[in-house]
C-alpha cells in the first residue's frame, strides 16, 4: 500500500503510483518515515517534515518534525514569535468523528493545534457529510484565552504519533 502524503503533489504522485501499480499488478510497501520537503512549508525549515501547518489571519502555526523530534512554531516566515519543543499529543474519538491535538507548553501558557472531524449531516443520498475544522486554542493557567480557526482545513499528520509523546486532551 502506498504511503499517505498531505501535500497536493504527494496526492498526485500517489494517484499516479496507484495507476502504475494497477498496470503492473504488483505493489511494494513503503517504509513509514518522515519525508523532508525540499521547500519549507509554512514555518518548517528545510529538512523538516510538516506535521501540521495552517494560516491564522496574517500569521502561521506549524509543527515540524525531524530526526525523531518535533517543534511548534508560531509567527511569520522569517519572523517566528514563539517556538516550543515541549509537546504532547492527544486523540479523542466521538460518535460521528474525532479530534487530534498537539499541545505546546511555554511557562503557564498552552498552545493547542487541533483538527476535528464531525458528522455535519446526511446527504440526500444517505451519505454522511463530514465537517472538518482546525485551529489553535490558547490557554493561560488552564483558562481559555483565545481560539482561532485555520484558514482552510489542516490535518495533523499520523506520523506525529511516532515522535510526540501522549498527553491530556484539552477540552474546548
Give the location of each predicted region:
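C-terminal partner/receptor-binding element of secreted or periplasmic proteins
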Residues: 132-133, 138-172
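N-terminal secretory signal peptides
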Residues: 30-92, 101
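Bacterial Sec-dependent signal peptides at the C-terminal "C-region" and cleavage site
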Residues: 21-32
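N-terminal secretory signal peptides that target proteins for export/translocation
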Residues: 1-7
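Short, surface-exposed coil-to-beta transition loops
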Residues: 57-58, 97-99, 131-133
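Charged, amphipathic alpha-helical segments
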Residues: 55-62, 87, 105-125
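Short polybasic amphipathic segments
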Residues: 67-76, 129-140
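Bacterial N-terminal signal peptides
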Residues: 12-22
Amino acid at each position: 500500500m502506498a504511503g499517505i502524503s498531505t501535500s497536493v503533489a504527494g496526492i498526485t504522485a500517489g494517484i499516479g503510483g496507484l495507476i502504475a501499480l494497477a498496470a503492473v499488478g504488483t505493489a511494494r510497501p513503503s517504509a513509514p518515515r518522515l519525508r523532508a520537503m525540499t521547500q519549507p512549508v509554512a514555518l518548517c525549515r528545510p529538512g523538516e517534515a510538516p506535521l501540521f501547518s495552517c494560516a491564522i489571519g496574517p500569521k502561521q502555526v506549524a509543527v515540524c518534525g525531524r530526526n525523531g523530534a518535533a517543534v511548534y512554531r508560531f509567527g511569520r516566515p522569517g519572523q517566528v514569535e514563539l517556538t516550543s519543543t515541549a509537546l504532547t499529543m492527544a486523540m479523542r474519538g466521538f460518535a460521528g468523528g474525532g479530534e487530534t491535538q498537539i499541545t505546546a507548553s511555554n511557562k503557564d501558557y498552552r498552545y493547542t493545534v487541533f483538527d476535528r472531524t464531525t458528522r455535519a449531516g446526511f446527504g440526500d443520498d444517505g451519505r454522511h457529510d463530514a465537517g472538518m475544522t482546525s485551529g489553535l486554542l490558547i490557554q493561560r493557567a488552564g483558562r481559555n484565552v483565545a481560539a482561532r480557526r485555520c484558514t482552510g482545513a489542516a490535518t495533523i499528520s499520523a506520523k506525529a504519533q511516532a515522535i510526540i509523546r501522549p498527553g491530556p486532551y484539552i477540552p474546548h
